A protein has these predicted regions:
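A structural micro-motif at secondary-structure boundaries
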Residues: 130-134
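DPxDG-like acidic metal-binding loop motif
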Residues: 72-129
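Small-residue (primarily alanine) positions within well-ordered alpha-helices
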Residues: 7, 11-14, 109, 211, ...
Length: 250
């Protein structure tokens, strides 16, 4: 099994657990904010993915959103249920995501949306696919006022320096904004050409790595600003510079 195939198998294993238990999520608790939650299903789905990875790649490390962690020269990054709040409320817009990193960045990734029966995968230098069909990102619009851009903003992140001002500029400049509740799926949709761009501050590793590789392997750009806060930005080629300039404007 290749790394790309293992990422897909692990993401599908997590998604199956979540799909089977929708409506029976068990205990739910808050993390950073009342609407930033974790359920028993999140943990069960993460276990399903991690157990498969540990069995197939016993020397690799892993990092799961819900606490699973082991060091290794390579690290599997797991978000077994991205979009938990959507999931708990019976909404679409959730997925399972697994990516593999080495010292040079992401090597392979998979994002599984069982509701739409879509599996996005990518490998470094080998392109991105959705259900086996190659993804080739179109150039997209050149200006923000023509663009469909996704974002998300948890309550604690609204307090970060400059964030509110940056969002005011986004509201003023972007043609249409979307907040679906699953950043990973939104990144997959950028890779598929369904969205023109994605921008979010202070993004966790498991919310960024799986989708970012999809975007770059489909022909887009996905980069972190490295500023404070650290904005993550992904977009079609022609839009990237315009979108990435928004957080730093005065």
């Amino acid at each position: 099994m290749t790394d790309r195939e293992l990422a897909a198998a692990a993401a599908e294993a997590a998604a199956r657990v979540a799909l089977a238990r929708q409506g029976d999520a068990g205990r739910v608790s808050a993390k950073d904010a009342p609407t930033d939650v974790v359920s028993e299903v999140d943990r069960a789905a993460e276990r399903a993915a991690i157990e498969l990875i540990a069995r197939e790649r016993p020397k690799d490390g892993y990092l799961g959103e819900e606490g699973a962690e082991r060091s290794g020269a390579r690290t599997w990054v797991v978000d077994a249920l991205d979009g938990t709040l959507n999931y708990l409320h019976g909404l679409n817009g959730w997925c399972a995501a697994v990516a593999l990193e080495d010292g040079h960045g992401a090597l392979a990734t998979a994002v599984c949306d069982p509701v739409r029966d879509e599996l996005f995968t990518a490998a470094r230098g080998a392109g991105a696919t959705c259900n086996g069909a190659a993804l080739h990102l179109p150039p997209g619009p050149q200006t923000l006022d023509e663009a469909l851009v996704a974002t998300f903003l948890h309550a604690p992140k609204r307090a970060l320096p400059g964030v509110i001002a940056a969002y005011e500029r986004l509201l003023a400049e972007v043609g249409s904004l979307r907040m679906t509740g699953s950043g990973t799926l939104e990144l997959a949709y950028v890779a598929a050409g369904r969205l023109h761009g994605w921008i979010q501050p202070a993004t966790y590793r498991w919310d960024w790595v799986p989708g970012a590789l999809l975007v770059t392997e489909a022909g887009g750009r996905a980069e972190r600003t490295g500023s404070e806060p650290d904005w993550c930005i992904a977009a079609a080629p022609r839009l990237f510079e315009a979108l990435s300039s928004v957080p730093g404007k005065q």
